[in-house]
UniProtKB/Swiss-Prot annotation:
SUPFAM superfamilies: Aminoacid dehydrogenase-like, N-terminal domain, NAD(P)-binding Rossmann-fold domains. Catalyzes the oxidation of 5,10-methylenetetrahydrofolate to 5,10-methenyltetrahydrofolate and then the hydrolysis of 5,10-methenyltetrahydrofolate to 10-formyltetrahydrofolate. Its EC number is 1.5.1.5, 3.5.4.9. The lineage of its organism: Bacteria, Thermotogati, Deinococcota, Deinococci, Thermales. InterPro entries: Aminoacid_DH-like_N_sf (IPR046346), NAD(P)-bd_dom_sf (IPR036291), THF_DH/CycHdrlase (IPR000672), THF_DH/CycHdrlase_cat_dom (IPR020630), THF_DH/CycHdrlase_CS (IPR020867), THF_DH/CycHdrlase_NAD-bd_dom (IPR020631). It holds the Pfam family THF_DHG_CYH_C. Homodimer. This is Bifunctional protein FolD. NADP(+) binds at residues 162-164, 187, 228. Pathway: One-carbon metabolism; tetrahydrofolate interconversion.
Amino acid sequence: MAAQVLSGHEAAEAVYEEIRARLRSLSFTPSLRVIRLGEDPASVAYVRLKDKRARALGYRSQVEVYPEDLPEEALLERIAALNADEEVDGILVQLPLPPHIRTQRVLEAIHPLKDVDGFHPLNVGRLWSGGKGLFPCTPLGVVRLLKHYGVDLRGKEVVVVGRSNIVGKPLAGLLLREDATVTLAHSKTQDLPEVTRRAQVLVVAVGRPHLVRKEWVREGAIVVDVGVNRVEGRLLGDVHPEVAEVAFALTPVPGGVGPMTVAMLMGNTLEAALLRRHGASG
C-alpha cells in the first residue's frame, strides 16, 4: 500500500483559518516588514510569496529592497530604526545575505520580540529552556504538520537527520517539548541507515537529493522530507520516492513542509504583535 500523503497545503490552510479567527477579535492589524538585498531569484520568489500571504490575511506588509552591496552598517541602522518603530510588529531579513555582511550580527540586531524568523539567540535560549518566544518557522511547521494529521509525538522515537541552526537543532528542541525521544543525526553519525531505521518518525533536512532510500526506513514509519533541491529544473526532496513503499505516511516535495514554513511565519507575526502588546498570545 502506498504511503499516506501529508499535504502541507491542507495543514497550512488550517493554520490560516485559526489566524483569521484570532484576527477578528483584535483591535489592531499585525505589521510585517521584510528586508531583501539584491535580486537573487530564489530570494525574490520567497519574499514575494511571504508578502502575498501576509496581505491575503490582512496584515500590513511591506518589502524593503536594497542593493546587494549595501554596507553592513547601513543594514544595521535600518534594523535599529524598525526596532524602534511602534508600528512594526515583525522584522524579517531574507537569507542568505551577501558575503560581506555578517549574518549572525544581523540576526542578533533584530529585537527578540520582532524576530519572526526565530533566530535571535534569546529566542533560541527560550526554546531550549521551555520559555515563551518566537521560534524558527520550518521546525514549527514540521511539528504542526504532524499534529494536523493526528501524530502523537509523546514517547515516539524520532530521528532528525541534519543539525543546522535553521531546522535540525531547533526542531530537536521543539520535539523534546512534545515529549518525543529525539536522536539528532548528521554527516558524522556512524552507520546512519541503522540509526534512521530506528525511527517511528523520521525527519530529513540535509539538502542532499534522494539521500534516504527505502532500506533506511522502518516499515510503517512517518517520514517528513524538509529537503528542497533543484536538479535539472526539478525540485527534489532528500527522501527517495521509493520510501513510499515502506512508510506509513510521507510529505511530498514540493507541497509538504514548504507551505507550512510560510504559514508559521504568519503565525509568528501574529504572536509577535500579541507578545509586544500584551506579553502573551491571545
